[in-house]
Regions:
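Cofactor-binding active-site loop characterized by glycine-rich and histidine/acidic residues
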Residues: 58
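C-terminal alpha-helical cap/extension of soluble enzyme domains
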Residues: 217-278
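Alpha/beta enzyme core
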Residues: 6-12, 16, 28-53, 61-75, ...
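Short active-site oxyanion
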Residues: 19-22, 79-80
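Catalytic-site beta-strand/loop segments enriched in glycine and acidic/polar residues
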Residues: 23, 177, 202-206, 210
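N-terminal basic/disordered segments at the start of proteins
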Residues: 2-4, 22-28
Length: 278
């Protein structure tokens, strides 16, 4: 197999009534582990780099993007590369040269009209440069280390009528929706509003994306896919597996034993969560 456009993986999943898992990576070990997990279950996967991950790497996108691309090229399953939660126009414009075929542009923190205007501009640029683009409408909390709001509070979730208009007016290729999940959850105790998901799936013609999926048990993930979610974003679950393994295998000097354990733990987590979607 090899590196393939992430948007194509989502489109194929949507046509088959399935979902593709998209894992946020921070280190080379993340990328290697996710691909190992996908190979175990024989399913495609997406590697995602967020703007925050790029900031962690001193603002340099190319080194980690090229490493992820090299891992994807050597994979035994189709692997997409996606630039996630982009707010900076400067970073958005680096996507093509860095080898990304898709981006998620995040203006969801803005009021509706401003979100629409910013997203439409980003979508116009993305399409002119051959990129598939995802956007977000609603409040999927827990970003940037912030305490997540009540995901079921009035106004936090995505309105189906607004979603229909937003997609039509912005021209995006996929929409991340707020239906009860939150970013950065370390326990799998969240629950989704499946009635709202059904209304969104009926209202919106593009694939729907679920963010904050680490906090959902397997049954909720499976129900989300059955209800119309076509891309499932996962990040914190990998980090919980990684840091737990590092603590258990920490050595005085040589990093290889604990990084080996961390990679193995993340691969096991990735395989299990990919399988839960199938």
């Amino acid at each position: 197999m090899s590196l393939v456009p992430a948007g194509a993986l989502v489109t194929e999943a949507a046509a088959a009534g399935r979902a593709v898992a998209a894992f946020n990576i921070i280190t080379l070990e993340h990328a290697e582990a996710v691909i190992e997990g996908a190979e175990r279950v024989g399913l495609p996967v997406i590697l995602q780099l967020s703007e925050n991950a790029v900031k962690f790497r001193s603002g340099r996108l190319l080194p980690i993007a090229r490493a992820a691309s090299a891992c994807a090229e050597a994979a035994g399953v189709p692997v997409g590369l996606h630039l996630d939660h982009v707010k900076s126009s400067e970073l958005l414009r680096q996507a093509v040269d860095a080898g990304f075929g898709s981006v998620m542009y995040d203006a969801a923190h803005l009021p509706y009209a401003e979100n629409l205007e910013a997203t439409r501009s980003a979508a116009d640029w993305a399409h002119a440069n051959g990129l598939w683009i995802e956007a977000e409408l609603g409040e999927v909390g827990g970003k940037d280390g912030a305490a997540p709001p009540d995901p079921h509070a009035p106004g936090a979730r995505t309105d189906p009528d607004e979603a229909r208009r937003f997609v039509a007016d912005s021209g995006v290729d996929a929409l991340a929706v707020a239906i009860g999940s939150s970013h950065a959850m370390t326990s799998r105790t969240a629950s989704l509003d499946h009635g709202l998901l059904a209304r969104l799936a009926k209202a919106v013609e593009v694939p729907l994306v679920l963010h904050g999926s680490s906090g959902l048990p397997d049954a909720e993930l499976a129900a989300a896919v059955a209800g119309g979610i076509r891309k499932v974003n996962i990040g914190t679950a990998l980090n919980v597996a990684m840091t737990g393994a590092i603590r258990a295998h920490l050595t005085p000097a040589d990093p290889r034993p604990y990084l080996t354990a961390a990679r193995a733990a993340m691969a096991t987590t990735a395989a299990a969560m990919i399988a839960a979607l199938d």
